[in-house]
Amino acid sequence: ASYGLPIERPILEGLMRCAGADASKVEFVDVGFDAFPALVAGRADIIWIFEGWDGIQAQLKGIELNLVRLYGSCIPDYYTPLIISGEETLKKRGDLVRRFLAATARGFEYAAAHPEESAQILLKHSPESDPKLVNASQAWLGPRYKDDAPRWGFQKAEVWTQFADWMYEQKLLEKKIDPARAFTNDYLPK
């Protein structure tokens, strides 16, 4: 089961090929953005999850998962989620974009440094959320917000190139793209 995004099936098929499995024997089911209940209810045998939320949820419920990483030797790494802007906005309102990204970076840096406090802020604005899940998720996510980047939001051209080339090979892109036109670090805080 997956969220139904066009990129998911080629990634899952690629993982299966690398493992020597036959993807044609799998029924792909779109369960929307709440895949975990489909697994628990037995409507799916395999689900695409966000480890920092669904994986934590499984752990809290005592459900053991066998995780297969989406990227590595078979599927190139890629950036997700992304903040996207139009070129015209960047040209005409670049200062606004810089301030927005600086504020966003401060928020992520605060969340990484203060996981308990940031979880409480989220719960204040999303009281329907499960406090145990929010706190455990934030504790797991905190050290990963920046990952191996020198600063929050920083992206590498080679990651874009490798994944774009893979997408082209999978016929998800009609033509190759120039990574320099796909992203920029120019608006990030220094």
Predicted features and spans:
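Pocket-lining segment of extracytoplasmic ligand-binding domains
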Residues: 34-128
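Secondary-structure end/capping motifs
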Residues: 92-172
